[in-house]
């Protein structure tokens, strides 16, 4: 899969039961945050599941469906999640996809052919089923969840307000309005107080309508 492509229309089995991405997520107006991990009962993946569990409510508040996946069996998933609960006191609240036949992993092109496991991948998909962000991480590195939340919030503001976000943007900071497409618009833009030049104009975050902001 590539950025801006349509997410596959498919059904999967998870630790919370069957999941149809379009019927259960996109058609309900939700975003999808899908993250793949290489294998159950591995050290880095365990720390990630503890971390993602702690921010589950934050994703839920943003109307984003958080879902994990790997090519392990559903029974391996269940046993691993039980182990996490026993050792860390955390009940993983989001569904974990079992993909032992690697069908979804191959559709997403996230199989490491040498080891046969899923790579450490992330997909953020909007309610139209379009991939708006994707990233791959080495097997030895854990993801920075705080940064993934920031990217998710940026994607939501971009989607709702049709604005861009500058370097190191955080919710509450200025956004960038689209560049003008005609010379007349460019000349008008240069007269605005927040215009750095004709193609770069900022807008205060609190000037966006309330329903276009995230916090």
Swiss-Prot record:
Broad class of enzyme this protein falls into: oxidoreductase
User: By its UniProt entry, which Gene3D superfamilies does this protein fall under?
Assistant: Glutaredoxin
A GO term from the CC aspect: cytosol
Reaction equations catalysed: a hydroperoxide + [thioredoxin]-dithiol = an alcohol + [thioredoxin]-disulfide + H2O
Q: Which residues form the Thioredoxin domain?
A: 1-157
- EC annotation from Swiss-Prot or TrEMBL: 1.11.1.24
Oxidoreductase keyword on record = yes
UniProt-annotated catalytic positions: 45
Q: Disulfide bonds, which pairs?
A: none
GO-annotated molecular function = thioredoxin peroxidase activity
**Keywords assigned by UniProt, alphabetized:** Antioxidant, Cytoplasm, Oxidoreductase, Peroxidase, Redox-active center
Where found, per UniProt? Cytoplasm
Q: What is its main location?
A: cytoplasm
**Pfam families noted in UniProt:** 1-cysPrx_C (PF10417), AhpC-TSA (PF00578)
Q: So what does this one do?
A: Thiol-specific peroxidase that catalyzes the reduction of hydrogen peroxide and organic hydroperoxides to water and alcohols, respectively. Plays a role in cell protection against oxidative stress by detoxifying peroxides.
Q: Other remarks on record?
A: The active site is a conserved redox-active cysteine residue, the peroxidatic cysteine (C(P)), which makes the nucleophilic attack on the peroxide substrate. The peroxide oxidizes the C(P)-SH to cysteine sulfenic acid (C(P)-SOH), which then reacts with another cysteine residue, the resolving cysteine (C(R)), to form a disulfide bridge. The disulfide is subsequently reduced by an appropriate electron donor to complete the catalytic cycle. In this 1-Cys peroxiredoxin, no C(R) is present and C(P) instead forms a disulfide with a cysteine from another protein or with a small thiol molecule.
Query: Known HAMAP family for this protein?
Result: Peroxiredoxin
Q: How does it assemble?
A: Homodecamer. Pentamer of dimers that assemble into a ring structure.
Q: Which family does it belong to?
A: Belongs to the peroxiredoxin family. Prx6 subfamily.
Q: In its UniProt entry, what is this protein called?
A: Peroxiredoxin 1
